[in-house]
Amino acid sequence: MSILSLVEDRPTPKEVYNWKIYLLAAVASCTSCMIGYDSAFIGTTISLQSFKDEFDWDSMSAAHQDLVSSNIVSLYQAGAFFGAFFAYPIGHFWGRKWGLMVSALIFTLGAGIMLGTNGDRGFGLLYGGRVLAGLGVGAGSNITPIYISELSPPAIRGRLVGVYELGWQIGGLVGFWICYGVDETLPPSHKQWIIPFAVQLIPSGLLIIGALFLKESPRWLFLRGRREEAIKNLCWIRQLPEDHVYMIEEIGAIDQTLEHQRATIGLGFWKPFAAAWTNKKILYRLFLGSMLFFWQNGSGINAINYYSPTVFKSIGVTGSNTSLFTTGIFGVVKTVVTFIWLLWLIDRVGRRLLLLIGAAGGSICLWIVGAYIKIARPSERENKQMDGGGIAAMFFFYLWTVFYTPSWNGTPWVINSEMFDPNIRSLAQACAAGSNWLWNFLISRFTPQMFAKMDYGVYFFFASLMILSIIFVFFLIPETKGIPLESMDRLFETQPIWRAHGTLLKQIREDEERFRHDLEDSGFVKSTDRQVEVVDA
């Protein structure tokens, strides 16, 4: 088996890998388009001269400018932090489908409020709209990865949850380029900077429409006792009849897991809270999932996403139009590499190895960029023309993007969506998403001050954190590719961690062979398309 081979936990009919499951993942991932667009457009929009003129930016002190810009950016993350936890009761009681609908409606309300912002009214509507939009995307960042992972066959679960990350990057690509577009094509005016705010309504509108046609998660339906509807939805998604051996195995595994949970954690709304505090295994896994987002934000990605003009200025890029263009190229690189990650890497190379490679390569690149800024001091030069050293620094910045994007950008979301049992999954994802938005908030809130005080030290700071993340992943995070959701407990109990994947996958295949042998002995035989029971005359 090569490193780029798909890993199946058992023989899987080709019907399982059908277009319907990709369509469901794509519709749900409109949530991440909302997130990606918002994270990309806001920093470049508030750097437009038309925005600064309308709000009399030049009359503010430098410290006041940093405060206002960090407030505009970080209030969104603050709302998203609370939205991630707000999604838990919605996802538990209403389901994944209607949870996605609620997140889209709240985001749309927030985006609409932002459109009322102008110089006369000040920043109040903008602040309020950012908080509401954050609530919406925070809820969506909880529910979407869970929904997709609960639909997915193990062999392509990473790829399908990766569609969520792809949506994030497509939204980001549009967000990075739209400000370059309005700066090139429209004269400085209120219209020039309000158009990027209005575009937020497109992905949320698509999600509202698409959510009406989504199938509810079969695993959530099983959890709520709606068995017939769950089996019907699962058969529709898998494109197989209920009595096919693959379906018998999957339904049996879900039943067995729920029965185990009923006897241990319990299936009620409050049971996961009690389990999280009393069960050390669950608490430990919550810690791992939350820490993945600490290390993700410790790479510096959100400092770059939200304040890309500041980042490029520190390297020596001058001129607002040039800064917008280089930011757009950053978005293109991320999107292209995300396609590669989605189609060839996440389910073939695996989660763990990608994190290790990305952290090592990304750290080296940031050390080089920081060293260039320390030695060359490009922001202090009278000659603003970028020299060979500056071009090399830009190369290593984009190389950092190539290392980071297929590793730490989307992989933590994939791992968190698959590493918990069904009844704890919503709460666990809320904790993971909340952790993401907490660190996101802190980075976005203090990045302007960090660049003002630390200068090149910002790059050394993030490079050091990426080195530390290698130790964390190697000793604590097992490989999860190809492992059924119902077997995650066994994976995290297998030691040593760096060999757990191979050990458990071998056990699962042996168990599956015994199951099929016992099934055939009990009166089932294979036919071309399905399994038929043998009845003696």
From Swiss-Prot:
Main location per the UniProt record: membrane
A Gene Ontology cellular-component term: plasma membrane
Keyword Membrane in annotation: yes
One GO BP annotation of this record: quinate metabolic process
Record key words, sorted: Cell membrane, Membrane, Quinate metabolism, Transmembrane, Transmembrane helix, Transport, Ubl conjugation
Membrane association type: Multi-pass membrane protein
Cytoplasmic side: 1-22, 96-97, 152-159, 215-285, 347-352, 409-456
Pfam families in the cross-refs: Sugar_tr
Positions in the Extracellular compartment: 44-74, 119-130, 181-193, 307-325, 374-387, 478-537
Transmembrane segments: 23-43, 75-95, 98-118, 131-151, 160-180, 194-214, 286-306, 326-346, 353-373, 388-408, 457-477
PTM (free text): Ubiquitinated. Deubiquitinated by creB, probably to control its activity or amount.
InterPro entries, A to Z: MFS_dom, MFS_sugar_transport-like, MFS_Sugar_Transporters, MFS_trans_sf, Sugar/inositol_transpt, Sugar_transporter_CS
Signal sequence residues: none
Entry's Gene Ontology molecular function annotations: carbohydrate:proton symporter activity
Record PROSITE patterns: MFS, SUGAR_TRANSPORT_1, SUGAR_TRANSPORT_2
Subcellular location(s) per record: Cell membrane
Subunit architecture: Interacts with creB.
Family the UniProt entry places it in: Belongs to the major facilitator superfamily. Sugar transporter (TC 2.A.1.1) family.
Function in brief: Integral membrane transporter that imports quinic acid to be catabolized as a carbon source.
The protein's name: Probable quinate permease
